Amino acid sequence: MSPRALILVAGIAVALAAPIAARAQTRGELVGPRTISTGLQETSAAVTPEGDTLYFMRSDFAERDDTIMVSHRVGGHWGTPQVAAFSGEWHDSEPALAPDGRRLYFVSNRPVQPGGAPLTTEMGGHRFAGTNLWFVRRQPDGSWGAPVHVDGALNDGAMIYNPSVAANGDIYFSAHRPDSGAAYQIYVARRTAQGYAAPQRVELGDVARNRMDPAIDPQQRFLVYAGNEGDSLGSADLYIAFRQPDGRWGKPLHLPGKINSPALENAPSLGPRFGELYVSSNRRDEVFFPKPRDNTATLQQRLQQPLNGSRNLWRFDIADVLRAHGIDH
């Protein structure tokens, strides 16, 4: 979700009593420095089950021009990304693969009917690109088919963000809806034989807290999301909630280690390996003065590097967090 949409609610820090340990195991790594992660905005990683292809969103700094990119792993490194075959014309963002890799979901302002006007929406007196949920199907030759609009109540309105798909087809997403409170909440649309049921809000606590960008475990045992539960280190941090024996969600826990920072962390997604977590963050390198004197060329080069305050992609390992809550695969 765009930083413009992060209308976060301040609160009193709360103490979280949870068996989260092994903080040293959650140090992250920048994904594809200068290839994937650049001086532009990159967010919303979606990695294929084989681990050899990465889809992500790249945009200008204001995130008014979003495009879905694709990169293939070559020789152990991510190759130069290209515009995905189904993107490049509309405001397309936030790709998410189904666990089996056969569908790729994304949000877009493209018109629902051919020849129509692009979607727009308004919030807090600001007008911006609207979004509905779309998907593409994997074809027998490995390519993607034409984008398909997801019909039904799930796409009511034009503020659907960051889809995440469970193994049974249930779709989690964030949205601003009549029961969202002042900002955003997380919803789930259950897949049925008749299509998708009306979305239900995921009960994670007081709706005065802003919650967005869900990343659902394929078996729906846990949910990672971005927000501020009162103890955020920055404008938004990442939290995890575990499914309880009675089916309800447990108290959200602030993820440990270096996953969160005083910067913005959001748009989490789960990789194909156990415990693999991709995160978008605008954390940056510190600049100390006096610095080595720049000339025009070195200044331009340095300012175009990742970690310049733009959002980049990071990869973390939360396997120990999951094991501490009885999940080992």
List PLM regions with ranges.
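Signal peptide processing junction and immediate N-terminal pro/mature segment
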Residues: P19-R23
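Bacterial N-terminal signal peptides
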Residues: V9-A18
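Short, conserved micro-motifs composed of acidic
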Residues: A24-H329
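Bacterial N-terminal signal peptides that target proteins for export
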Residues: M1-V9
